[in-house]
């Protein structure tokens, strides 16, 4: 049979001083490049946009956020306008409030989940721009800091 070799970087990553933060689907190189900081017991992380958990769609209730994407519902033109969803770009790092992805995707007041936008919008009900989770905290110890430079291409200096 054929032989393959799989190399993984970042599998099992954790934030030493933040036990309630789960890191997934990312690499040590990307985390270092994100310029994380700490203040008042919170892990401050640059994000391009903050999304309300109540507008999340496809993926809610999934049992595993280590694969697949979670969609921001964008089928309603009114919702797109109200939440400026048309400004989301591929590669943006976004924060989802009141949303925990530690052991699957679920609504939880006070939780924060971070993800990278990996696909565009959709006309299918409950779908829209999709994010792959990179970090989550059920206790909200993550503090998102808005900056338009929070995009994977800027963070990693990609052409």
Where are these regions (language model features)?
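Conserved mixed alpha/beta catalytic, RNA-binding, or beta-rich assembly cores of soluble enzyme
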Residues: 1-159
